[in-house]
Amino acid sequence: MERYIVGLGEALWDVLPEGAKLGGAPANFAYHASQFGHSAVAVSALGKDDLGDQTAKELDEKGLKHIMPRVDYPTGTVGVELDADGVPTYDIRTGVAWDYIPFTPEVEAAAHNCSAVCFGSLAQRSEQSRETIAKFLDATPDDCLKIFDINLRGNFYTKEVIQESLKRCNILKINDEELVAIGRLFGYPGLDIENKCWLILGKYNLDMLVLTCGTNGSYVFAKGLKSFQETPKVEVADTVGAGDSFTGAFTAAILSGKPIREAHELAVKVSAYVCTQKGAMPRLPEKFTAQIKD
């Protein structure tokens, strides 16, 4: 049976100064992974409203499979403001559809046929979605890549949620600011960046830890290996979705059998390109996608 790369969690609309654009880390991730020839699916929940209809329509138009049951809450929206460098701050609405993702038979079937799943901390702010994410992860095959793209937002996370997620994942994706927050949360703020990463990798027996540091480059740590890549200098339109495109490209490359350093190099190039485009889900040029398509 065909196996899927799954983005699991929040489906929402980023309300930017120039208008609303479909976003949410899981859909962004799944969309970018799908551009490399992998079957991908976004799993979330939508409201029984016009925005829910528009979400399904837009994902269909992008050719992205989605499992998003309709629930009795509004489809998620996020107010996004960009600073002079295109870096976003978020006003995330609460009590929305993706806070109530049900573990339906179709969602469970996606877990059983999953080659990689990416999830974050934001959708775990509510009990129902947190339980669905845990059940999904526990139902995946043994060889599934379980990527915790931590995505700390505001105060929508707890130490317990982070620890449980680290126990369930085998790859952690984190940025430098989040690493500082986690160091503070877990009581090892004195260590330098690299030692914090090695400590987390060993403590939670992770296969890989991916650290992005904005314009200061990015790292991949694995047992016996450290990869570093400079961040290319580009004309930034906005950075919304850039991290998700990095994770999507990296995951697709690893599943295609690429070595870690090669997967890392591709992810950096893809992420830099997405920064030059408006919105989180631009179409990627073939010079990127052709590198790992069969």
What positions do the PLM features span?
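Conserved beta-alpha-beta core of the PfkB/ribokinase-like small-molecule kinase fold
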Residues: 116, 120-195
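Conserved phosphate-binding/catalytic region of the ribokinase-like
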Residues: 1-4, 186, 190-294
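Structural alpha-helical scaffold elements that stabilize or flank donor/cofactor-binding regions
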Residues: 109-110, 164-165, 202
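Conserved N-terminal subdomain of the carbohydrate kinase-like
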Residues: 39-121, 142, 291-294
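Glycine-rich phosphate/adenosyl-contacting loop at the front of the ribokinase-like
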Residues: 1-64, 78, 236-237
